[in-house]
């Protein structure tokens, strides 16, 4: 093992507050893997929550593993150092169970790279009795885990707070077992659990046009449809940062979840669908959390699909102020922005507020079911100016269904009007206040009304970005940031693919993550998964899951969107 890498890991752990170290003797050992860098993974509240819940079990030792920083990859290769845990610097092969927490489809390739680096067979079918059991959780696991199915012994479908202890109990209950039998007995004990998907227990058949013909269980005790695991009582588990480190993307700011789900029903939004029903933590529960946070931190970031819709947001802001805690909110809806809320943010030191109009015209906002008017956006700017919050960040998407050139041109035009309402004069007589446009390429996601829509042509998306950037250059205080449309195309492939995409993922992992080259060498057809409209009667790769959203309701919303109709109620 590289002493340089080991020393870096020890330095990271020594800079943390809240790290758990346990003796291994007699305990179930679990490697909790975030397949991205330490800074990204430590900013993920779900990852921290599962780490906390597992280590709260006395018979478990859970340690973290991250994908190496770019500057460390060469050192891993040069010294043949496999991925290892932060807490004890043990290699992945030493653990009983390996759990990948996957939030972004782009991390699929990193996950397989880590298995390769560890010397663990990447395909579940190739692992033997001496290999760790490999599982996957996170939002990608219950949107569409099929591209990763070949690599996983099992998948946690849904919210993991309760099911992790049941997984541990199943592992303990599979002992004693005959030589080589424990893995099979463990998987058999998992199959009846709600929220557990064992890919190897299903056969996928393909028919004419390479479409899925059926997904069938291979045994009578295997459910035909895998039900999502849903946390019934969000107050039962406190969801806040348990590990603090200056190396995370958010630095010393603690994160606090106010609830799960969103009732708005935006037609493009995965999170608003798969985390239903909406569940808010009680004000009293959050009050207790804030009191604990305030003992060690003075900055907190509120986390939720739509924080400004929290029913007691005004009361919560007052609780935070009473404890002298500065608050950050990732994004706010213009139609739920109040004077009291903006005033609280200003007192908390906010310099930038973020909103997500998503589209440049009210027509297209109606199509995507983001019912925010231009006037509401202007009024939000007036509030920011009145309370001295100078900067605004707005999220927009291009490539949305029914989008026209006029919709794209409207983005910088709307931005100019927002900037005009936002800016005030500084002491030198010049306007201060900046507007950032964050423009992303729309990726149709499973479990949304837009799951039948095609992904736009990357070249067309690049042209649209050029149009927006050229128009924005005329305004000095507007900045445009965006992702590469070809990276969005990769995300579309991984989000919408089926089990056949595993070959591409494994190929890219073998090419050290060079997915562009992998796309050229793969014998599959990426456009089949990305650029093709799906038919209403088509079996989708994720149809053998039930996340609480009815396909018929999503289809009705898709038809209404194409008719540019936005009803008052969300699809259920």
Task: Identify the meaning behind each predicted range.
Residues 32-36, 54, 242-268, 351, ...:
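N-terminal pre-triad scaffold of radical SAM enzymes
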Residues 32-33, 106, 288-393, 397-436:
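Conserved SAM/AdoMet-binding glycine-rich loop
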Residues 1-22, 26, 30-32, 465, ...:
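Radical SAM enzyme core and accessory elements
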Residues 2-31, 38-39, 205-255:
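N-terminal [4Fe-4S]-dependent radical SAM core
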Residues 47-49, 115, 149-152, 171-172, ...:
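Short secondary-structure boundary/capping segments
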Residues 268-285:
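Iron-sulfur (Fe-S) cluster-binding segments and ferredoxin-like electron-carrier domains
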Residues 71, 203-207, 264, 311, ...:
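Flexible glycine/acidic-rich beta-alpha junction loops that bind and position SAM and/or redox cofactors
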Residues 67-218, 446-498, 505-511:
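Glycine-rich beta-alpha loop elements in corrinoid/cobalamin-binding modules
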């Amino acid at each position: 093992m590289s002493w340089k890498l080991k020393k870096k890991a020890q330095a990271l752990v020594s800079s943390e507050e809240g790290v758990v170290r346990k003796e291994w003797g007699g305990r179930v050992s679990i490697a909790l893997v975030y397949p991205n860098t330490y800074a990204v993974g430590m900013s993920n509240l779900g990852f921290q929550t599962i780490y906390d819940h597992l280590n709260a079990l006395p018979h478990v030792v859970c340690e973290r593993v991250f994908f190496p920083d770019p500057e460390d990859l060469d050192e891993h290769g040069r010294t043949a150092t496999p991925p290892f845990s932060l807490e004890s610097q043990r290699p992945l092969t030493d653990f009983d169970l390996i759990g990948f927490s996957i939030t972004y489809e782009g991390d699929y390739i990193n996950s397989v790279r880590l298995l390769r680096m560890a010397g663990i067979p990447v395909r579940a079918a190739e692992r033997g009795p001496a290999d760790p059991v490999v599982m996957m959780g996170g939002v990608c696991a219950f949107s569409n885990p099929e591209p990763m199915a070949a690599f996983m012994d099992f998948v946690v479908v849904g919210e993991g707070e309760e099911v992790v202890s049941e997984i541990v109990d199943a592992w303990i209950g599979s002992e004693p077992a005959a030589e080589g039998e424990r893995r099979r007995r463990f998987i058999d004990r998992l199959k009846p659990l709600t929220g557990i998907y064992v890919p190897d227990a299903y056969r996928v058949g393909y028919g004419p046009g390479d479409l899925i013909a059926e997904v069938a269980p291979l045994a009578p005790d295997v459910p035909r449809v895998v039900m999502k695991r849903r946390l019934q009582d969000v107050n039962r588990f406190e969801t806040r940062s348990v590990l603090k480190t200056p190396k995370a993307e958010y630095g010393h700011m603690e994160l606090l979840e106010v609830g799960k789900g969103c009732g708005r029903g935006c037609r493009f939004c995965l999170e608003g669908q798969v985390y239903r029903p909406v569940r808010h933590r009680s004000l009293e529960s959050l009050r207790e959390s804030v009191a604990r946070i305030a003992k060690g931190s003075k900055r907190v970031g509120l986390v939720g699909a739509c924080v400004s819709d929290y029913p007691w947001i005004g009361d919560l802001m007052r609780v935070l102020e009473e404890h002298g805690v500065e608050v950050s909110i990732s994004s706010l809806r213009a139609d739920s922005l109040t004077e009291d809320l903006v005033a609280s943010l200003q007192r908390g030191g906010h310099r930038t507020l973020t909103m997500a109009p998503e589209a440049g015209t009210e027509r297209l906002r109606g199509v995507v079911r983001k019912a925010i008017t231009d006037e509401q956006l202007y009024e939000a700017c007036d509030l920011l100016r009145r309370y001295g919050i100078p900067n605004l960040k707005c999220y927009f998407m291009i490539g949305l269904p029914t989008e026209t050139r006029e919709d794209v041109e409207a983005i910088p035009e709307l931005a100019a009007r927002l900037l005009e309402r936002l800016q005030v004069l500084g002491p030198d007589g010049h306007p201060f206040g900046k507007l950032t446009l964050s423009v992303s390429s729309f990726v149709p996601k499973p479990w949304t009304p837009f799951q039948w829509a095609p992904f736009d042509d990357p070249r067309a998306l690049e042209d649209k970005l050029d149009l927006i950037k050229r128009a924005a250059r005329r305004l000095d205080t507007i900045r445009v940031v965006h992702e590469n449309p070809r990276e969005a195309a990769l995300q579309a492939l991984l989000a919408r693919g089926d089990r056949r995409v595993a070959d591409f993922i494994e190929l890219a992992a073998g090419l050290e993550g060079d997915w562009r080259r992998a796309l050229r060498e793969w014998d599959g057809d990426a456009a089949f998964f990305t650029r093709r409209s799906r038919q209403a009667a088509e079996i989708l790769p994720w149809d053998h899951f039930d996340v609480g959203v009815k396909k018929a309701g999503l289809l009705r919303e898709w038809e209404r969107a194409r008719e540019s109709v936005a009803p008052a109620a969300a699809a259920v």
